[in-house]
Curated annotation (Swiss-Prot):
The lineage of its organism: Bacteria, Pseudomonadati, Pseudomonadota, Alphaproteobacteria, Rickettsiales. One of its GO terms (biological process) is tricarboxylic acid cycle. This is Malate dehydrogenase. Belongs to the LDH/MDH superfamily. MDH type 3 family. The gene is mdh. It comes from Rickettsia akari (strain Hartford). NCBIfam families: MalateDH_bact, PRK06223.1.
Amino acid sequence: MKKNPKISLIGSGNIGGTLAHLISLRELGDIVLFDVAEGVPQGKALDLMQASTIAGSDIKITGTNDYKDIEGSDAIIITAGLPRKPGMSRDDLISINTGIMKNVAENVKKYAPDAFVIVITNPLDVMVYVMLKASGLPHNQVIGMAGVLDSSRFNLFLAEEFKVSVSNVNSTVLGGHGDAMVPLARYSTISGIPIPDLIKMGLSSNENIEKIIDRTRNGGGDIVALLKTGSAYYAPAASAIEMLEAYLKDKRQMLTCAAYLQGEYGVHDLYVGVPIIIGKEGVIKVVELQLTKEEKTLFDKSVEGVKTLIETIQ
């Protein structure tokens, strides 16, 4: 009987719990749900196992407060950290979450050095950088969940604008996972037709698309403002699952993620949201898009924002 992949989730809050539920429903692998809060991962694991029986899933879910239980994990998704609250930017979280991430990284290195690691904790581009440097894992094994989520928001808003199914929309969002992200209308399509061409057909306007781009940049903040006590979790979890599945099933899928750049896009030693191909080797390739002067200026501005944050923790 083939052994299930072992998937460890570091952090058992809203995103961690949602991740576990989605992994179980898709039967992607057995789950270890870790948290420092005693009883929380154990209780959620019991609840999730009982929910899984209704769906007919035989996936095993274990709750724990001991990092040793992540030993030998095939994949790890990290959500541990303080969530955003109203009035906070992703960047306000940097000091507290850097300390948390360093501790997580040390334990990942100790117990699961061969795992493929997906970081969700904000501020994303900094946290995934901390994970890489503190763990010493190869950069192709460590990525951040950013562009898949940002693109999903862009997809939704474009589908609403053009009154089509979201399945017809394919969009691209580059840069840091923050207010300076760069949604690219030129590289976004409806059934293969680029947005600029649809504008020329009179189906939308540059003004409307710019409003959608702004709404995409503020997508996470809008949810924080409405929830008041936390941040988005369903969409971030669903986004990470798409990345996880691409790795576990060797799908060689092109997704926009926070990837470690070594000269691509003119960026060195930073994590920034760009299209990559994910398969069983982790990050197989970084895809370099040809940007216009205006797009490159916006991208560079976003990169500078990430650099500035990195400098605050060094």
